[in-house]
């Protein structure tokens, strides 16, 4: 009967049955007959129509064998399927459904031996599987997903409900089989198809096998995985050996021998070794998931990873920890970083963007703050790591983080509770602690974002973006603040949805701390061995801080402290020694034109890659230092009752002088001497002591910076400081070197009152320092020594160095000769000149208008700027005085400022105020061709003297032409105080205008009487007392040598204002103490006009500066047409 049945079978069934060897029931490791299997494969290849019948027959036979527990027959069936797949991979779609049905029957058998035998077949199926077939047949798709899910469930570490518990070795075998199947799926092309739900099945099972409370175990697994990869990738370079010389640790197949622990260790050690092997397999599976070159294969597993971590957080597992140094660490961070390193370089940024997307889209409540903190810690760890995130949009990430900050500070409750630094205990306090922790982590994320710099101005753009959010809207701007602080760049501030983000105090503090973190991360090794490293980016320019000085007067003390901390960090990290060199901004345009002409030929040779435009040279002029010193002045008077605020100002002033040198001192010295005069207007004795400490602390800083300790001014300053400190007339914390910002107390909080002797308060006085001219001379001398001491480095090729000085153009680089190492005359005049807050505001407004005009057109807008900044002859006043002090004139003036000679013919750019007939005549004559050879001969022979710089009231200016060689920017020397001409200007109309615009005020009191205490404590102090001079104050003969501490003036002190209002300026007088401004010396620009020998003149500059005037006009004027400035 059996013989007849065999003869009636189809041929494909006969060939299949011949592949099964004769075995007993329950036999394992059975293999098919090789010759019959080869013939079966040939038969299926030659007759493709039979391959579907073969698959159906194997499916029916497997069902019978599984039911009767014929393990050997099942193993033979699985091997036949694997051979068919490998032999005819193109024919797999014909019998793929049969393969999945057979695998599903094996998985339902719950026999570990059958399941382990099915792994090679499933691996061959995944390698040759066509992913497009999954989208074509939904029934086949569901069948495939079911098989994958069953295999993945085998790797679970959690016991399945309703099933018997397996022993430890058997459980490890089940997990190993499941991970092998997962690795097969992860390495196939099916993951790149539309079946994204597979990640939700595979990734959690992989992570379960990697989960451990000891994160160091991950490092061990990673080392083993990397070692295995190195062995696989290493070329076969060993010498061939005979079988007799085979190593005892290797088998003939080249596989490593068994671990000695398996033989020598206990059962516990063997289980640990098996756990480690499973961990290595799980890590290989995770690596295979992320290494695929597909962006979807990076996005989807990242979401699955974040969901698994979220589940662990819900189970109160500690996935993120903090080490002893305060850095985040833990299992979640290590797995997240490993996944980022395994992903393709071009797709790594997808992992970060996915994490930020999940973070920002998650609801923000007190219940899920742990999830936010965990993900923020993971993002911060990835940002500060060395993982390259090519393609990352830094500004988009920054805006998302700022938007999440906004959501955090706008949560229900008191946002100021996040300002508390101490950790509190309790239900509500615990939620507040979680909020503070999340805010701190978001600040870290913003700072760590600076690790990845992909273009030169990225750090500047990041800081400017944050500072832009700090600027208030127009209705809430301070009425007297800088125009830079009021205007918004192209309306971006008003269009941004984050405009109200920093309206809260806690948001301002967080933003400023984030800026500090950016600067710390962007310049990690700024000062090693006293120098700066070369950065592959541009340094943050000073223009970035324009319009932020109002933060120094914020009502909240922590905001003021955070702002000073950010500015001090910027000075520490972003400035170079070249920034302390004097940079004459008034002559910047002339230097640019001259340097452009000299380097024109050299620039033609430079390649296009090297001819990078220097942005610092084209950057608009910054008024930040002027307005910052103005804010310091207002801050000192507004918060005079708080010593911490004055110490904070001292730290800021000291850092400005230390890093910027004379570039900061030219604004700080006039302001500090004005503040010294205002000491007498302070009501309380403690307030006078505090302001006096700030003033002398700044002078102390100048003497240390420019090495003036051994000079007479330095001795006088140090002597007065010693005297005040000996009598407790000093603020604790104003020292040199200045303390760190972190060591300064909270501004706005009063300290305990100092212990002062009331008798000393009634009898002593504060000696002001009036030797201003000698101090400026010492600073100039010290600057010249500092400028000549460091060796100059050779110049680099143009355009290849991104490290530009942050103060301005590189055209004014290291001085070349001895004269250029001196302090410019404009700097000296600024340091010796007068200072008022109205003049500072007017100058900055005029400078901003000029910058806008120079960057715009040459038409009507430039005329409007000049009309706003120049004064007419009708006596209209401005904070700077009359227009007779604004531009030089070639005709001498009389004692009262009236022009003695005929009106000077203007240059092409000079204009008379409007369309007057005289103006038309001058322009017509200026446009006529004239001969200036006689003037040139006079200059070459030495008979032509430079014209005086006095200004006539009829001086007129034109700005409707661009052909003039005179610099359009106003030089500081044209606005400064001229002691030589002060006597002749007392009655001039230009000076009476300033006197009329300001009420009288008291200046330094008359130094004619001795103080009630004894002689000076140091020899240098006597020179200050004996050499002090000045005009009598408003109290007449009642004044003494110093400012009395216990005496209060009849005029009340200006009331403190909020951050959005400015202090009323103390009333001033038109008569100033000449001794306190410039001593008895004449200004540097008046030496040539007093009969001294004029300096050598540049012939090239003179030829360009010859005025277009006739010879008769030259002879009638008796001098050149205009000075060659």
Swiss-Prot record:
InterPro entries: ARM-type_fold (IPR016024), EFR3 (IPR039786), EFR3_HEAT-like_rpt (IPR049150). It holds the Pfam family EFR3. Residues 242-252, 845-854, 878-896, 975-1011, 1046-1071 have a biased composition (Polar residues). The gene is efr-3. This is Protein efr-3. Belongs to the EFR3 family. Residues 240-261, 471-493, 788-819, 845-1093 are annotated as: Disordered. GO terms for biological process: protein localization to plasma membrane. GO terms for cellular component: plasma membrane. The lineage of its organism: Eukaryota, Fungi, Dikarya, Ascomycota, Pezizomycotina. Residues 788-798, 855-877 have a biased composition (Low complexity).
């Amino acid at each position: 009967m059996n013989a007849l049945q065999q003869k009636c079978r189809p041929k494909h069934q006969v060939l299949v049955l011949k592949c099964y060897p004769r075995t007993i029931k329950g036999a394992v490791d059975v293999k098919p007959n090789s010759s019959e299997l080869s013939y079966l494969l040939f038969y299926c290849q030659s007759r493709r129509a039979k391959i579907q019948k073969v698959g159906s027959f194997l499916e029916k036979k497997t069902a019978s064998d599984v039911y009767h527990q014929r393990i050997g027959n099942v193993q033979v069936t699985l091997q036949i399927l694997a051979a068919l797949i490998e032999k005819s991979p193109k024919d797999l779609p014909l019998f793929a459904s049969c393969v999945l049905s057979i695998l599903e029957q094996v998985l339902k058998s719950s026999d570990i031996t059958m399941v382990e035998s099915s792994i090679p077949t499933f691996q061959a199926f995944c390698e040759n599987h066509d992913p497009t077939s999954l989208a074509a047949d939904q029934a086949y798709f569901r069948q495939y997903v079911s098989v994958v899910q069953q295999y993945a469930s085998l790797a679970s570490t959690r016991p399945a409900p309703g099933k018997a518990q397996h022993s430890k070795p058997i459980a490890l075998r089940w997990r190993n089989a499941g991970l092998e199947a997962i690795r097969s799926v992860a390495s196939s092309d099916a993951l790149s198809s539309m079946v994204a739900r597979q990640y939700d099945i595979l990734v959690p099972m992989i992570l379960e096998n990697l989960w451990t409370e000891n994160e160091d175990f991950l490092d061990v697994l990673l080392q083993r995985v990397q070692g295995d990869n190195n062995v696989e990738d290493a070329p076969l370079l060993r010498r061939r050996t005979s079988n007799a010389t085979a190593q005892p640790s290797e088998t003939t197949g080249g596989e490593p021998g068994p671990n000695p622990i398996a033989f020598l260790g206990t059962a516990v050690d063997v289980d640990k070794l098996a756990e480690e092997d499973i961990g290595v397999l799980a890590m290989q599976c995770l690596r295979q998931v992320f290494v695929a070159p597909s962006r979807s294969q990076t996005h989807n597993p990242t979401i699955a990873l974040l969901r698994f971590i979220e589940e662990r957080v819900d189970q109160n597992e500690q996935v993120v920890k903090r080490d002893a140094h305060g850095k985040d660490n833990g299992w979640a961070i290590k797995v997240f970083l490993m996944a980022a390193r395994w992903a393709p370089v071009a797709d790594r940024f997808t992992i970060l963007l996915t994490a930020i997307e999940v973070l920002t889209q998650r609801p923000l409540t007190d219940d899920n703050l742990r999830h936010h903190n965990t993900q923020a810690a993971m993002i911060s760890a990835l940002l500060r790591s060395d993982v390259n995130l090519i393609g990352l949009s830094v500004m988009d990430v920054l805006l998302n983080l700022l938007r999440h900050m906004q959501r955090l500070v706008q949560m229900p409750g008191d946002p100021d509770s996040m300002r508390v630094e101490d950790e509190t205990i309790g239900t509500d306090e615990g939620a507040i602690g979680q909020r503070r922790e999340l805010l701190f982590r978001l600040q870290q994320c913003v700072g760590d974002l600076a690790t990845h710099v992909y273009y030169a101005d990225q750090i500047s753009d990041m800081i400017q973006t944050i500072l832009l959010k700090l600027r208030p809207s127009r209705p809430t701007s301070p009425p007297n603040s800088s125009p830079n602080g009021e205007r918004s760049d192209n309306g971006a501030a008003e269009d941004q949805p984050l405009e109200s983000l920093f309206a809260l105090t806690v948001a301002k503090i967080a933003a400023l701390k984030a800026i500090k973190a950016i600067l710390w991360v962007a310049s990690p090794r700024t000062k090693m061995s006293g120098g700066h490293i070369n950065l592959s980016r541009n340094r943050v320019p000073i223009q970035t801080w324009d319009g932020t000085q109002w933060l120094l007067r914020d009502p909240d003390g922590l905001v003021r402290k955070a702002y000073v901390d950010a500015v001090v960090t910027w000075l520490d990290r972003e400035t170079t020694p070249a920034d302390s060199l004097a940079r004459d901004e008034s002559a910047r345009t002339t230097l640019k034109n001259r340097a452009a002409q000299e380097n024109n030929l050299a620039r033609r040779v430079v390649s296009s890659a090297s001819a990078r435009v220097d942005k610092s040279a084209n950057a608009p002029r910054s008024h930040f230092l002027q307005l910052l010193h103005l804010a310091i002045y207002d801050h000192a008077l507004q918060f005079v009752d708080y010593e911490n605020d004055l110490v904070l100002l001292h730290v800021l002033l000291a850092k400005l002088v230390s890093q910027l040198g004379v570039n900061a001192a030219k604004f700080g010295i006039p302001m500090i001497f004005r503040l010294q005069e205002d000491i007498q207007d302070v009501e309380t004795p403690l307030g006078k002591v505090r302001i006096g400490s700030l003033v002398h602390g700044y002078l102390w800083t100048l003497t240390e910076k420019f090495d003036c300790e051994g000079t007479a001014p330095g001795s006088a300053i140090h002597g007065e400081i010693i005297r005040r400190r000996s009598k407790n007339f000093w603020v604790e914390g104003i020292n040199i070197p200045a303390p760190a910002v972190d060591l300064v107390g909270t501004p706005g909080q009063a300290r305990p009152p100092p212990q002062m002797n009331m008798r000393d308060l009634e009898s002593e006085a504060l000696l002001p320092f009036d030797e201003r001219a000698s101090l400026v001379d010492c600073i100039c001398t010290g600057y010249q020594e500092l400028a000549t001491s460091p060796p100059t480095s050779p110049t680099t090729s143009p355009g290849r160095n991104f490290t530009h000085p942050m103060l301005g153009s590189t055209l004014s680089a290291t001085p070349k000769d001895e004269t250029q190492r001196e302090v410019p005359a404009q700097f000296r005049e600024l340091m010796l000149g007068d200072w008022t807050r109205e003049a500072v505001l007017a100058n900055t407004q005029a400078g901003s208008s000029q910058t806008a005009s120079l960057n715009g057109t040459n038409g009507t807008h430039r005329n409007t700027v000049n009309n706003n900044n120049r004064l007419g002859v009708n006596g209209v006043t401005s904070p700077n005085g009359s227009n007779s002090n604004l531009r030089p004139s070639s005709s001498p003036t009389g004692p009262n400022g009236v022009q003695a000679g005929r009106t000077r013919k203007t240059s092409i750019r000079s204009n008379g105020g409007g369309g007057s007939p005289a103006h038309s005549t001058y322009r017509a004559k200026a446009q006529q061709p004239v001969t200036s050879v006689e003037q040139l001969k006079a200059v070459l022979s030495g008979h032509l003297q430079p014209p005086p710089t006095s200004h006539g009231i009829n001086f007129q200016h034109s700005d409707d032409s661009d052909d003039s060689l005179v610099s359009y920017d106003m030089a500081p020397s044209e606005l400064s105080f001229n002691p030589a001409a002060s006597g002749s200007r007392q009655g001039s109309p230009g000076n009476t205008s300033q006197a009329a615009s300001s009420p009288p005020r008291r200046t330094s009191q008359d130094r004619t009487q001795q103080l009630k205490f004894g002689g000076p404590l140091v020899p240098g102090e006597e020179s200050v007392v004996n050499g002090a001079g000045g005009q009598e104050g408003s109290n007449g003969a009642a004044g003494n040598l110093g400012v009395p501490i216990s005496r209060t003036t009849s005029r009340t002190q200006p009331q403190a204002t909020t951050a959005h209002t400015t202090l009323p300026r103390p009333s001033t007088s038109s008569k100033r103490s000449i001794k306190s401004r410039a001593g008895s010396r004449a200004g540097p620009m008046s030496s040539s006009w007093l009969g001294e020998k004029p300096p050598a003149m540049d012939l090239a500059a003179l030829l360009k500066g010859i005025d277009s005037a006739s010879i008769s006009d030259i002879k009638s004027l008796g001098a050149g047409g205009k000075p060659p400035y």
